[in-house]
Amino acid sequence: SDPVIKHLPGLAGTAYDGVTVEQVATMTSGVKWNEDYTDPKSDVAQMLLVAPVPGELQSITYAKRLTREAPAGSKWVYKTLETNLLGDIV
């Protein structure tokens, strides 16, 4: 599978560097994420509030804040951001 940065070069140097498109599609990127809809400080809530950066996709802007919690391919965690990244690719 292609590296995700091949299709979204704005992710180079982020926690998504070294992650494949397949790992994003299977939500096994290893990127730390909080999908708690009841927590206003969760990633899923904060992602929607990120200030726009001219010429940059909102998903890329938010992804730049994230860190890795596990090696890519080793842990499944549902991440709304990753569905957005896949949409950005296609």
Language-model-derived ranges and their functions:
Residues 1-32, 36, 65:
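Active-site helix/loop module of the DD-peptidase/beta-lactamase fold
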